[in-house]
Amino acid sequence: MNADVFRSTCKQYMELRHINTREKLRAHTTIGSQHTFQKYWNDPDLIPMGVWEQIMDCLNVPTEDRLKMLK
């Protein structure tokens, strides 16, 4: 997964959903600590698939964009 594509897509949908900080995004997932979320944000390849799905569901990312991120 390309980290830049992941971050840019997340930021795009965060704006649409009025989630203006990564901390608010983290609150919608089961990620417990800020440190862990920061680690995942910097290297999306480390994100477990279940958590990745939670992030995408929270942001209402369409299937097409999800598939682009996984390529």
Identify the meaning behind each predicted range.
Residues 1-26:
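A short, Lys/Arg-rich alpha-helix, primarily the initiator
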Residues 13, 28, 39-40, 69-70:
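Residues in the recognition helix of alpha-helical DNA-binding motifs
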Residues 19-21, 32, 50:
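Residue-level signal for the short linker/turn that defines the boundary of a DNA-recognition helix
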Residues 26-27, 56:
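The alpha-helix within a helix-turn-helix
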Residues 29-30, 59:
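Core residues of bacterial helix-turn-helix
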Residues 30-47:
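Recognition helix of helix-turn-helix/homeodomain-like DNA-binding domains
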Residues 43-57:
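Short, basic-rich loop-to-helix N-cap that marks the start of a DNA-contacting helix
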Residues 60-71:
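Short C-terminal boundary/hinge segments that cap the last helix of small helical domains
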